[in-house]
Design a protein with these regions (language model features):
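Extracytoplasmic/periplasmic ligand-capture domains
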Residues: 16-51, 99-100, 117, 121, ...
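Conserved positions in beta-strands of structured domains
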Residues: 113, 186, 250-252
Length: 603
């Protein structure tokens, strides 16, 4: 499975001694920032597999987003989270994974796995629901969803390297002899199709689960204009009512810089226990508000229905609420934003490339990351450092495997010295060519959390004579740097997904991946450790025995925690507020599923 790009005060001590980094449990025990009191004033309601109660139709959900969509195109959505948030409401995946029960469940299709142990092959048979349609808003026109839609998307969109889909490389498996073989798809009939794996794989449903677009629109565009024709479909300047939907919603209005309006799709397949079509909501109005303070003001004024709290909002919304809303809380997030450094050889003439490609430099940066200070000053004590690669729900999570490069200025200085980076008489860090150590740190303009975190990083590195220039930019500019120009130094970024399965991140961890952030799309591994990661990732994918698999994934995690290509930041405890005009019977909020409002209805 591939990832998508997404973007997530006490006195400070300035001694050079190591500062202990407290866990969330320790912070709670010490009463830091009144965590116990805050939790007592909020609602804990994680989803644990409960059935959803029948509701009633009606109501308009009012929400806000930070970012403009780049397109309404499913292919573009792979690299743009703002686009993905919109497009995915008009599509559906074949399956969904229930993290509570740890099992796959049907969505658009049912799946059956057939293993041929003698031939060492595997086939996944899918059968689409019979009530799936590409529907058009305010029209009787409906086009049946068939296996041809899935097969076309797999072969002609994801499977065409010219389309630059992040799913391309995952269609190939490395065979025991080192050769590559393709995972083929074949049509059985109008509803049924099958993926044939040339060797047995550990997570075939994860590997084959996918979204797909309408063949009757994308195929003519590709025949006429190739990959560019595909990517130019559904631009933001079209009439959105012309976009078909097989999902919960139609997009019926888009006013650039202002808002989007969605209407429920009455032909959507999902029904409640009484057979009523979902969602219950008739409409959703989404305002585009880049400024987080304005988002907060809209919520407090009753002009939006929900709001995800920042640390600085806790006191005002939790301790001084007006009774018009309820705040839910969740445990620390499974994933975290990270700090990473550009190792792309396109920049090999820059001094930063020489520094960033040495693991001792990256390890030193991890030792200069004062996570306790970030937790206290940025998160008000409501977070904890992410030291492990895999989260606890991952079956191969190993609590003994933790990051070893914690906040320690002396150790950082020793690591830098080992690669010839030392302070001069004026306290400025210089490399072995007498160049001052200075680099940029790119962050999103809309995120106050990233801005505050970057300021702490700059301050901590300055203690050792390293200059950091904070570059604030919008998300689209960050995406351009990461995927097109590669002209960045370091960046704070986040990815969707949380490694619930060890083989998630097929476009992140292998060196060929387009989200192998620090040096993407490698033809051959640039380093020995990346070659080893490629090998382990591949072996782990095909290892069924849990004991053998544990050894593989342990080494995989250990290498990445040692090499520090991604330095993870904080796991944040979540707080989410919702207007009390809604019925909360089917509302849940937790760190695995986020905010569950699919079955919400108006009081």
């Amino acid at each position: 499975m591939k990832y998508l790009l997404v973007i997530l005060c006490l006195c400070c001590f300035f001694s050079c001694s190591r500062t202990q980094e407290l866990s969330l449990a320790e912070l709670e025990a010490q009463g830091t920032e009144g965590l116990s009191e805050i939790l007592a004033k909020t609602v804990s309601k994680p989803w644990r597999g409960e059935e959803f109660a029948p509701g009633r139709l009606g109501g308009t959900w009012r929400s806000v987003v930070k970012d403009e969509p780049k397109s309404f195109n499913l292919l573009i959505a792979e690299q743009d989270s703002a686009t993905a948030a919109i497009v995915r409401s008009m599509h559906d995946s074949l399956l969904e994974y229930d993290m509570v029960r740890r099992e796959w469940k049907p969505r658009a299709a049912e799946a059956q796995i057939v293993v041929d142990e003698k031939a060492n092959t595997l086939t996944v048979f899918y059968a689409l629901r019979d009530d799936l349609y590409w529907s058009y808003y305010n029209s009787d026109r409906k086009v049946k969803v068939t296996s041809d839609d899935v097969i076309f998307w797999y072969n002609e969109i994801e499977g065409d390297p010219a389309c630059l889909s992040s799913g391309f490389h995952s269609q190939f498996l490395t065979m025991p002899d080192g050769s590559e073989a393709h995972v083929d798809i074949r049509k059985i009939d109008e509803r049924r199709f099958a993926f044939h794996f040339p060797r047995i794989i550990a997570d075939p449903l994860l590997h084959t689960n996918m979204d797909f677009g309408p063949r009757h629109i994308y195929e003519p565009a590709k025949k006429q204009g190739g990959a560019d024709g595909v990517r130019n479909l559904f631009r933001v300047d079209i009439d959105p009512k012309t976009i078909p939907s097989m999902g919960e919603w139609f997009l019926v209005e888009y006013t650039q810089g202002q808002r989007m309006v969605f209407k429920r799709n009455p032909n959507y397949w999902r029904k409640d226990a009484n057979g009523a079509s979902l969602p219950y909501l008739e409409e959703e109005i989404v305002r585009i508000i880049p400024d987080e303070n304005t988002q907060l003001l809209l919520f407090r004024n009753g002009e939006s229905d929900s709001y995800r709290l920042r640390p600085e909002d806790i006191d005002g919304l939790v301790n001084r609420g007006d009774g018009s809303y309820t705040v839910f809380n969740s445990e620390g997030s499974l994933s975290a934003a990270f700090w990473t450094f550009n190792q792309n050889p396109q920049n090999k003439d820059k001094p930063q490339y020489e520094w960033f490609t040495q693991k001792e430099f990256r390890q030193a940066m991890s030792c200069l990351l004062n996570r306790s200070r970030i937790n206290t000053q940025v998160y008000r004590g409501l977070a904890e450092p992410k030291y492990s690669l895999f989260p606890e729900p991952n079956p191969y999570y190993n609590p003994a495997l933790k990051l070893q490069y914690l906040y320690d200025l002396k150790r950082a200085e020793t690591l830098l010295s080992s690669i010839g980076i030392k302070k001069d008489s004026a306290g400025v860090m210089r490399d072995n060519k007498n160049r001052p150590v200075e680099f940029d740190l790119s962050i999103r303009s809309e995120s106050t959390i990233n801005q505050d975190t970057a300021s702490i990083i700059r301050d901590e590195l300055a203690k050792l004579g390293i200059k950091v220039n904070i570059r604030v930019m919008d998300f689209q500019k960050q995406v351009e740097q990461l995927f097109s120009t590669f002209d960045w130094d370091s960046i704070i970024m986040g990815l969707s997904g949380s490694n619930i399965f060890p083989s998630q991140g097929s476009n992140v961890w292998p060196s060929t991946g387009n989200l192998h952030m620090w040096n993407p799309n490698q033809e051959t591994p640039a380093t020995d450790w990346e070659a080893r990661i490629d090998y382990l990732y591949n072996e782990g994918k095909f290892t069924i025995d849990p004991v053998k698999a544990q050894g593989i994934w342990d080494e995989f995690q250990s290498i990445l925690l040692e090499e520090c290509p991604l330095i993870h930041l904080m796991r944040t405890r979540g707080f989410w507020a919702i207007n009390n005009r809604w019925d909360f019977t089917n509302v849940y909020f937790d760190n695995m599923n986020g905010a569950e409002i699919s079955y919400i209805w108006l009081k």
